[in-house]
């Protein structure tokens, strides 16, 4: 009997549109001969299932069920592809844990920790992993321009501590731009991260593990036409993405080993993608960890799956079946 899978998309952040695009990608990637697929759209208190005829029906949040043709239907598995809250920060994971519904991503603790960039990077720094110098700023607290310059330096990145898709991120080059950048970042998050600029080659590496296998994908090199890998570069084609990355083999191997190690240190589950920057001397520096990576047709993970010579349908089946 086919399992019924919810592709859970939407969310309560600026990344909603990106998430819905990932849902369409996943709908095309997951094996429809093996699974019954439904996209579940979440936005605030609106939780709806998209039915085969395109109409939408509400989700009963008491048990994550829905009605179709007068029949109550239950989901066997949730593939979470929400970027931002509530799907990337542990909230939905806790909900599904309460209901006993298996899901694709990391658990509550890991999701919450990786969503908090500052906390996650400081934690991994304790394992000897290189990260940029940074500081955290919470709402209600102020920081002077001089403090930023003295502690972090210019240029620097000012960004939401919780969030993705480069919403609210500013590369700050001058003293005059510091406070406006902080205000912009606070529009996306209650905490702002101020991070030192590192000059180098941006790369990203995907990985997943099951009970019987470990897969670390080929690395992608990101060459942005913009100041940094911002929203336009990510989603509007304003970047060149090269898979496999143009790295010396020993550097590439270190990145692959580090990706696998971080997966285990944090206790990740499902597909993750880790962003790095390679600085002078082939130093590998962690940027951030994505536990619900984008899954549009042109996203990094599908690119890396193709470069590895794998079938993405098989990868999706691995992710789902590993939870049963």
Identify the function of each model-found stretch.
Residues 196, 206-207, 263-295, 305:
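Conserved metal-phosphate-binding beta-hairpin within the catalytic cores
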């Amino acid at each position: 009997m086919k399992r019924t899978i919810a592709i859970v998309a939407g969310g309560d952040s600026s990344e909603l549109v990106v998430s819905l695009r990932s849902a369409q990608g996943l709908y095309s990637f997951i094996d429809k001969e093996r699974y019954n697929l439904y996209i579940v759209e979440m936005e605030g208190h609106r939780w709806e299932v998209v039915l085969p005829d395109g109409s939408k029906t509400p989700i009963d949040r008491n048990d994550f069920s829905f009605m179709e043709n007068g029949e109550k239907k239950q989901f066997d598995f949730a593939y979470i592809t929400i970027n931002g809250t509530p799907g990337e920060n542990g909230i939905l994971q806790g909900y599904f844990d309460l209901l006993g519904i298996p899901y694709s991503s990391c658990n509550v603790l890991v999701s919450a920790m990786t969503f908090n960039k500052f906390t996650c990077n400081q934690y991994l720094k304790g394992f000897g992993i290189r990260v940029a110098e940074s500081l955290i700023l919470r709402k209600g607290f102020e920081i002077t321009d001089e403090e930023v310059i003295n502690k972090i330096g210019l240029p620097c990145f000012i960004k939401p501590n919780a969030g993705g898709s480069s919403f609210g991120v500013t590369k700050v080059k001058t003293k005059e731009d510091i406070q406006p950048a902080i205000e912009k970042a606070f529009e996306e998050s209650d905490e702002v991260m101020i991070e030192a600029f590192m000059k180098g080659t941006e790369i990203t590496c995907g990985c997943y593990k099951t009970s019987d296998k470990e897969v670390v994908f080929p690395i992608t090199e990101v060459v942005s036409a913009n100041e940094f890998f911002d929203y336009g570069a990510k989603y509007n084609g304003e970047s060149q993405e090269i898979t496999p990355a143009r790295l010396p083999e020993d550097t590439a191997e270190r990145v692959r080993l580090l990706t696998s190690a971080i997966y285990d240190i944090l206790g990740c589950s499902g597909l993750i993608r880790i962003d790095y920057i390679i600085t002078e001397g082939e130093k590998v520096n962690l940027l951030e960890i994505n536990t619900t990576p984008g899954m549009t047709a042109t996203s990094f993970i599908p690119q890396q799956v193709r470069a590895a010579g794998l079938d993405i349908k098989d990868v999706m089946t691995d992710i789902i079946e590993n939870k049963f």
